Amino acid sequence: MNQPIYTELPPANFPGEFPVYRRNSSFSRLIPCLTETWGDLPLKVDDSEDMVIYTLLKDALNVGWSPFNFSAGEVKSEQREEEIVVSPAETTAAPAAELPRGRHYRGVRRRPWGKFAAEIRDPAKNGARVWLGTYETDEEAAIAYDKAAYRMRGSKAHLNFPHRIGLNEPEPVRVTAKRRASPEPASSSENSSPKRRRKAVATEKSEAVEVESKSNVLQTGCQVELLTRRHQLLVS
């Protein structure tokens, strides 16, 4: 018997499965040979491998089988569907960008009208607040706080500008209630009431009349003196 009983396709073409067989017409010619010499086969009952061979031969006699002529190109592995992961949409909107804020200095508070107040807690007075003043800018108020804190706590003080302590800068100017310049005299006379302006005009006129009368008196006195001297010269 030169023809093999069965052939299998390579296992790679059938991953995870047994090969499929069908009945072959040429196999029927082997049946008399197998049936006549069935009892002469050297198979042992207590050998597991012999029992496997026995089972295969028995099935071949009862059914008859041979593998299909599958080509490697006909067998195609199923493409695995790609899992599409959809990221959940963001339900919450991005937080709105905060408006930029100025730097917050230690001991400085912004007043409702736009100025900046400086204050400090005095440890000698059980942490009571000490008012340092109101300033035009937050930097001036921070400098005022630094100077007061350095006087109270020395090198242990937490400062806004520690690098400016040794510069001996002048004290920042506080904002006071009366910082307006005094009005000029000319502008005061222009902004006065009509009665005051009439009174000022009358005063100027009276002063002019008085000066004129004085000049007339002086002129008359000079003329009398000249006439007296002439009379004396004629008599002599």
From Swiss-Prot:
Molecular function GO terms recorded: DNA binding; DNA-binding transcription factor activity
Endpoints of the signal sequence: none
Cellular compartment(s): Nucleus
SMART domains linked to this entry: AP2
Keywords, in A-Z order: Activator, DNA-binding, Ethylene signaling pathway, Nucleus, Plant defense, Transcription, Transcription regulation
One of the record's GO cellular component terms: nucleus
DNA-binding region in chain numbering: 104-162
Tissue: Expressed in roots and at low levels in buds and leaves. Highly expressed in cell culture, especially during the exponential phase.
Region described as Disordered: spans on this chain: 163-214
GO biological process: defense response; ethylene-activated signaling pathway
Classification via InterPro entries: AP2/ERF_dom, AP2/ERF_dom_sf, DNA-bd_dom_sf, ERF_plant
Main location: nucleus
Basic and acidic residues bias (residue ranges): 201-213
Induction / repression: Highly and transiently expressed in tobacco mosaic virus (TMV) infected leaves. Induced by methyl-jasmonate (MeJA), and by ethephon (ethylene-releasing compound) in buds and to lower extent in leaves. Quickly and transiently induced by salicylic acid (SA). Strongly induced by wounding, independently of ethylene, and through a de-novo-protein-synthesis-independent regulation. Wound induction is reduced by MeJA.
Composition bias, Low complexity: 183-192
Domain notes: The AP2/ERF domain binds specifically to the 5'-GCCGCC-3' motif. The affinity of this binding is higher if the seventh amino-acid of this domain is basic.
Function: Probably acts as a transcriptional activator and may be involved in disease resistance pathways. Binds to the GCC-box pathogenesis-related promoter element. Involved in the regulation of gene expression by stress factors and by components of stress signal transduction pathways mediated by ethylene, that seems to depend on a protein kinase cascade and to be influenced by methyl-jasmonate.
Family stated for the protein in its record: Belongs to the ethylene-response factor family. Class 1 subfamily.
UniProt-recorded name of the protein: Ethylene-responsive transcription factor 1
Source organism: Nicotiana tabacum
